[in-house]
Amino acid sequence: MFAIYKSTLLLLPLILILLITPQVSSFLQPIQPPISPQVALIEDKARLGSTPPSCHNRCNNCHPCMAIQVPTLPTRSRFTRVNPFSGGFVRPPSSLTTVLDQYSNYKPMGWKCHCNGHFYNP
């Protein structure tokens, strides 16, 4: 009878600790107020970079169709119009172009959908 009483005394504190521990740990976690939609929108706009587009049904039934980042080609023209009415074009001075290209480290990236070595527009 003493053995049953002794084992009960050992199990009772263990059971109490197991029952109380989840409740205590829930009190220790910091409670954060709910985020308003305006704050969430500002946080999304403040994030750098862009998010990948959905490539669902973009690769002509090729699977897996995945969004990847690819370098984009510069869109600026190397020729400028002299007179809009004359239709003539002139190349800008090469020294100006060289200076601008020399110090430019901007490498624009864009998104494409990729599947089996082929690229598709998202």
UniProtKB/Swiss-Prot annotation:
* Localisation per UniProt entry: Secreted
Question: Which N-terminal stretch is annotated as signal sequence?
Answer: 1-26
Query: Mainly localized where?
Result: secreted
The protein's superkingdom reads Eukaryota
Q: Check the record and name the InterPro entries matching this protein.
A: EPFL
Q: Which GO terms describe its cellular component?
A: extracellular region
Keyword Transport on entry:
no
Mind listing the GO biological process terms from this record? Answer: guard cell differentiation; stomatal complex development
Sorted alphabetically, the keyword list is:
Developmental protein, Disulfide bond, Secreted, Signal
Which Cys-Cys disulfides exist here?
A: 55-113, 59-65, 62-115
* Function recorded in the entry: Controls stomatal patterning.
By sequence similarity, the record places it as follows:
Belongs to the plant cysteine rich small secretory peptide family. Epidermal patterning factor subfamily.
State the protein's name. EPIDERMAL PATTERNING FACTOR-like protein 1
Identify the species of origin: Arabidopsis thaliana
